[in-house]
Amino acid sequence: MAVVTLSEMMEAGAHFGHQTRRWNPKMSRYIYCARNGVHIIDLVKTAVCMNNAYKWTRNAAKSGKRFLFVGTKKQASEVVAQEAARCGASYVNQRWLGGMLTNWTTMKARIDRLKDLERMESSGAIAMRPKKEASVLRHELERLQKYLGGLKGMKRLPDVVVLVDQRRETNAVLEARKLDIPLVSMLDTNCDPDLCEVPIPCNDDAVRSVQLVLGRIADAINEGRHGSNDQRARQKYS
């Protein structure tokens, strides 16, 4: 059975690419045509890629691989956090901080600092500090929660990075490739398919398209880990 149907992708707007002048010629193999100056993605090929991505991700999860979801643009942020949490993956959905992968030792220390501050807050230790000091600590806590909250469960580097917008997340792509971490990547018509191991050509700007793809990837991870793809926690985004 197909992982995703053509009607589901059409309804989600997964076929809409970027303006033709903004395309990457390497994506030509996944483009069906151009209409009114906009490239239309070939959803038959997207369906094939989704099947491949599902099987690849499921097998990776079955073998114990750890996943990191990355998508920091506004329309993807909530979906990234939701679907990563549903399948037990780590995530970055606000801003990619330089060195998140390539300077992992330093990043791990900052995550540990976040955990320490959370313990201090929950125990009342921060409230017992002088007002000014408590304010500084809470500001630090809020900032770390915003940018590193999705990484608290990540004990070491991920084995796979799942990416929403390749062009926006250039630094994440470069760091993953430098460390030979495979990328499962949504690819709009302005992307480079040569920069990922598992391509999924589709609209990476529409919330419903992002939800459809990440939802299936989360299903694959759950199936690989637990033998079933729990879809109960899925949400719909307008």
Swiss-Prot record:
HAMAP family linked: Ribosomal_uS2_B
One of the GO BP terms on file: translation
InterPro entries in alphabetical order: Ribosomal_uS2, Ribosomal_uS2_bac/mit/plastid, Ribosomal_uS2_CS, Ribosomal_uS2_flav_dom_sf
Organism, scientific name: Prochlorococcus marinus (strain SARG / CCMP1375 / SS120)
GO molecular function: structural constituent of ribosome
NCBIfam families: rpsB_bact
Alphabetical keyword list: Ribonucleoprotein, Ribosomal protein
Family: Belongs to the universal ribosomal protein uS2 family.
Name of this protein: Small ribosomal subunit protein uS2
GO cellular-component term (any): cytosolic small ribosomal subunit
Record-linked Pfam families: Ribosomal_S2
